[in-house]
Amino acid sequence: MDRVIIIGGKGSAIVIAEQIYDAQIKVGNIEFLGFAFDDESFGKEINGFPILCKTYNAYEEYSKYNDVKFIFQLYRPDLIKERINLLNSYRIPINRFYTFIHPSCVVARSAKIGFGTAIMANCVINPNTIIGNCCTIHSNSLIGHDTELGDYNFFAAHSVVGSNNTFGEGNFVGLNTTFNNYITIGDYCFVGMASNVIRSIDSFKKVYGNPAKEFTKEIKPL
């Protein structure tokens, strides 16, 4: 049995914690230990799960336990690159990150999923899909066949990604967003909720709408 610590404590970190706990009850091959989180205003627990340590010393505290692995969930749409740099500063070996797939998901045998990626309830990952390390795919999302996602991509719930697409790294995709087939999304792009992306997007672009178009306003922190 693997035991999991989530680095983070707000938003998606809590969602993933609850889904790991759900899998723990239904399947029993995983145990959620608690959070590594720095905000002391939360006290000693979040939603009944303990805060075990700070983010920066999580690996130091638990590296001696070979069955303890980590999931990183400190992503923010306005600070994606900074948060990826923060993750890398912890110097946690990639094989100590846990790949979580909720038992309700359908994942093709030919799909390849990297370390530290979390795939939430009722997602479908179609054949020959490649998903990189430390990605997050929230509930009821679909990744089309022959699509490749780089590292650190975040998809909010109800995302639909068409087939034969390529995503770089560090992209943030809002709720209920749809992507056409045969398009390329660069690195560190932001796609606003309910967007319909019908064309490729260059790196570092912010888009939203139907069809999705570029915008320049600052992204509000979540």
Question: Regions from the language model: what does each represent?
Answer:
Residues 1-71:
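A solvent-exposed beta-alpha-beta segment
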Residues 9, 37-38, 75, 102, ...:
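Cofactor-binding loop segments of dinucleotide-utilizing enzymes, especially the Rossmann-like FAD-
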Residues 17-19, 83-86, 131, 202-203, ...:
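Short amphipathic alpha-helical segments
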Residues 8, 70, 97, 144-145, ...:
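Generic structural signal for conserved hydrophobic packing positions in ordered secondary structure
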Residues 42-101, 106:
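Phosphate-bearing ligand-interacting subdomains
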Residues 9, 151, 156-222:
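Glycine-rich hexapeptide-repeat left-handed beta-helix
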Residues 1, 32, 65-67, 94, ...:
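A general structural motif
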Residues 77-85, 89-147, 153, 159-165, ...:
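Left-handed beta-helix
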